[in-house]
Amino acid sequence: MSNLTPREIVSELDKYIVGQNAAKRMVAVAMRNRWRRQQLDPALRDEIAPKNIIMMGPTGVGKTEIARRLAKLSASPFIKVEATKFTEVGYVGRDVESMVRDLMEIGIALVRAEENEKVRVKAEARAEERLLDLLLPGGAPQPAPAQGMGGLTFDLSASHSGGQAIPQPPAQADASQASPPTGTGSAPDSRSSTREKLRTLWHGGKLDDREVDMEVEESGGPQVGVLSMPGLEDVGSQVRDMFSKVFPSRRKRRRMKVRDAFNLLTQEEADRLIDHDRVSDLARERVEQTGIIFIDEIDKIASGSTQKSSDVSREGVQRDLLPIVEGSVVNTKYGMVRTDHILFIAAGAFHFSKPSDLIPELQGRFPLRAELSALGKDDFLRILTEPHNALTRQYTALLQTEGVHIEFTGDALREIAAFAEETNAQTENIGARRLYTILEKILADLSFEAPDRSGDRVTVDSDYVREHLADVRANKDLSRYIL
């Protein structure tokens, strides 16, 4: 677990998110408290539960991004779900426990990737030896293709290797021109020499683009269409997993490049080296101790919401959420997962409701509240320039791939920021996402013509911005559809 201090966490979040300091400080303290809890005695550690957070603010101000960056910073399993996708038990829709099962799948993928990286060098070494076994010609004299080991056929002619023929041992020479070696050690020595020559060619990249036929395991397995009704996806997944264990895995022959064959062999060897039971145990522990579940649109299931629905009980969804948030045990295919120490971050705009419209029991499970402010012109200007992944840097890098170099002037950025604020005020306020639509409109022609303008340098100034937004500014109704 990361032992960054709250100040360091906020500093890292500042690299990608502008403003919203109160929310950043709150999640930084929540993350630091997890580290503090791990330093305690086990008896006291189990008594300390995370303080769940509700973020309030309009769309596009950074609620989801704060939680996502926090999870990435701490290498924690993270999942974003929407409260409106869940329904009360007995209705058609996903049950709330599915979010924990999905989080466990993410945890498994996260830990498996880490374990793969640990054994990568050893797996690649083993895969290389298997690849050489496949490439090394057999003992039977055949013109071409030659039959390799492991059920792989390989054309050894020079026409597929860029003009360079793969060396073959004397055992494969034409019987009419060469006699079998009489010495007992000559054949193994020749085979070893050929193997090393193949290794040299492989390391030099001379074999990457050659094609081979290789038997691989079918990843899909038998397609069992069972219980595919809405709301029963989890049950159907478990039944399919059961059938996949009953039916033997099928293999099929595929033609692929040697580089792709090496990658498949590396993955096979990594799977053999990894202890999958240990992966499940580590993933379950990480999910239980450091998992983060981000519940978006929590305001849509509050009783004060003006959106009515006759077939879904919003209060029922809240009551189903209670045991998960408070701490319960959820059955997954990797074992039982406790939710006592998973951090829940709920978020919503709360335009037509307020946190107090949630049922009191659920309010009590989210003791911390952070209000995110709407973005203005100055915030938009900072978003365009300060973050490491600023939109201007993204568009500049994208067009550079076509050989077009663009430069945004300061007055152009101020013009874009002012127009974003104006459009958000006159239409729907979508926060920083407005910058995407404006920049796409400004650079639409340039992006289309970029392949024909390689080597050009384009300066985007305020006049350029006003020219490309003139039609939208002149027609306010048009701006509602385009921006």
UniProtKB/Swiss-Prot annotation:
Biased composition (Basic and acidic residues): 192-209
A GO BP annotation: protein unfolding
One annotated GO molecular function: peptidase activity
Record carries keyword Oxidoreductase: no
Subcellular location: Cytoplasm
Key word NADP present: no
Bias-annotated ranges (Polar residues): 182-191
Biased composition (Low complexity): 136-147, 171-181
Gene Ontology CC annotations of this record: HslUV protease complex
Binding of ATP, residues: 18, 60-65, 296, 361, 433
Residue span of region Disordered: 136-212
Keywords: ATP-binding, Chaperone, Cytoplasm, Nucleotide-binding, Stress response
InterPro entries with a match to the protein in the record: AAA+_ATPase (IPR003593), ATP-dep_Clp_protease_ClpX (IPR050052), ATPase_AAA_core (IPR003959), Clp_ATPase_C (IPR019489), HslU (IPR004491), P-loop_NTPase (IPR027417)
Domain of life: Bacteria
Main location (coarse class): cytoplasm
Summary of the function given for this chain in its UniProt record: ATPase subunit of a proteasome-like degradation complex; this subunit has chaperone activity. The binding of ATP and its subsequent hydrolysis by HslU are essential for unfolding of protein substrates subsequently hydrolyzed by HslV. HslU recognizes the N-terminal part of its protein substrates and unfolds these before they are guided to HslV for hydrolysis.
The family this protein is said to belong to: Belongs to the ClpX chaperone family. HslU subfamily.
Subunit-structure text: A double ring-shaped homohexamer of HslV is capped on each side by a ring-shaped HslU homohexamer. The assembly of the HslU/HslV complex is dependent on binding of ATP.
Protein name: ATP-dependent protease ATPase subunit HslU
